[in-house]
């Protein structure tokens, strides 16, 4: 019997190298029956089996060492994966909380926004976009520019400021056309619209001769127009009372115009109504006036102003073509007590908003 002594030293997990510690080589000397403590154990096996056992032990030690080295190498990658996963999870949680808060705040804002505010913001945005479109078209005039300016006139005629005087305009056209055929009503409406266009053209000529366009007069003209709108709104709301001088109180324009033809009366009425509605068309109109003042071309300037005023008065012409519908609107005269307060509220709100926007522009608040 041959005694083969094997001693296996365990592999340390803290070593920086991954070399397996192999068992002691099989001793080829004579068999020994003693064993020293800590060096191994006596295995009484035949010589043939001793060789096979040592090979199996070596193979097992190598596999164990390779497994431990693989674990050591993969530990940093595992830790990095866990760290990245934690960061992604935390970011997703924060994004969810932020999204919920934004949805909650937007839902609250939409809930607080009334239909009137939404409609007013829509009309205001449409007016600003129309003004920007006109400015873009003035850089290179074409037939498309005329269509854009005509559309800008339509948008301006639907502004809240213009709508505040729309009941008066419709009431005048309806009352003026009572008892007359449609052709005469349409003719008077055209004369009324020409009166509006004349006032706007006079403003353009005055601005051209003075050499002061909307963008060159600073804050004076918009602030003055806004202040006038606020005063007129307070007057319609009966907060303040405006009295004309005695000369105007003794003068009755209706009696003076009674002997004039109906078309002339409509034309004069258009001149008066345009004075009330001209501050409402300030953005687009002033852009056109500025271009006319700088281009010094009366033909081009007159064509642009005519196109704009045509779009501005187009809703009135369309309304005038439905004389029967206008007459049916007169049946609601019992509700006319609400016209002045509503018109005053429109004028007051538009005047205050424009005044604050001119005095404290939003661009100056941007850091």
Curated annotation (Swiss-Prot):
Q: Which domain of life is it from?
A: Eukaryota
Check the record and name the InterPro entries matching this protein: Cyt_c_assmbl_TM_dom, Cytochrome_c-biogenesis_DsbD
UniProt keyword list = Chloroplast, Cytochrome c-type biogenesis, Electron transport, Membrane, Plastid, Thylakoid, Transit peptide, Transmembrane, Transmembrane helix, Transport
Secretion signal, residue range per the UniProt entry: none
* Alphabetical list of Pfam families matching this protein: DsbD_TM (PF02683)
Membrane topology per record: Multi-pass membrane protein
- The residue ranges flagged as biased composition, category Low complexity, are 26-45
Gene Ontology BP annotations: cytochrome complex assembly
User: Cellular location of this protein?
Assistant: Plastid, Chloroplast thylakoid membrane
Locate the region Disordered.
Answer: 24-45
Entry GO terms, CC:
chloroplast thylakoid membrane
Using the UniProt entry, state which stretch of residues is the transit peptide: 1-68
Bilayer-crossing regions: 76-96, 102-122, 148-170, 190-210, 220-240, 273-293, 299-319, 336-356
Role played: Probably involved in the transfer of reducing equivalents from stroma to thylakoid lumen and required for the biogenesis of the plastid cytochrome b6f complex.
The family assignment reads:
Belongs to the DsbD family.
| Protein name listed in UniProt | Cytochrome c-type biogenesis ccda-like chloroplastic protein 1
